[in-house]
Amino acid sequence: MLDVEAQEPPKGKWSTPPFDPRFPSQNQIRNCYQNFLDYHRCLKTRTRRGKSTQPCEYYFRVYHSLCPISWVESWNEQIKNGIFAGKI
């Protein structure tokens, strides 16, 4: 299982997330959630294969820029407890 408590933000300059054509409307809730899922899927896949998780930093930065902190904390708690509804 992934250790969601040990996640640290990547170093370097943070910028505004670029436009994502999958989410053209102003409402970015789905974009936030999808990037959260993509980040955890990326971590899971790359860790399992023994590869660097550095490419996953993009998703981390995007969901941390778009998602409210309370949502992220709630989702991480659900993952930790094994009750997260999303498919990771």
UniProtKB/Swiss-Prot annotation:
Compartmental location: Mitochondrion inner membrane
Superkingdom of the source species: Eukaryota
A family per Pfam: COX6B
Cell division is among the record's keywords: no
Region (Disordered): 1-22
Family: Belongs to the cytochrome c oxidase subunit 6B family.
Function, as annotated: Component of the cytochrome c oxidase, the last enzyme in the mitochondrial electron transport chain which drives oxidative phosphorylation. The respiratory chain contains 3 multisubunit complexes succinate dehydrogenase (complex II, CII), ubiquinol-cytochrome c oxidoreductase (cytochrome b-c1 complex, complex III, CIII) and cytochrome c oxidase (complex IV, CIV), that cooperate to transfer electrons derived from NADH and succinate to molecular oxygen, creating an electrochemical gradient over the inner membrane that drives transmembrane transport and the ATP synthase.
Self-association state and partner proteins as the record states: Component of the cytochrome c oxidase (complex IV, CIV), a multisubunit enzyme composed of 14 subunits. The complex is composed of a catalytic core of 3 subunits MT-CO1, MT-CO2 and MT-CO3, encoded in the mitochondrial DNA, and 11 supernumerary subunits COX4I1 (or COX4I2), COX5A, COX5B, COX6A1 (or COX6A2), COX6B1 (or COX6B2), COX6C, COX7A2 (or COX7A1), COX7B, COX7C, COX8A and NDUFA4, which are encoded in the nuclear genome.
Identification of the protein by name: Cytochrome c oxidase subunit 6B2
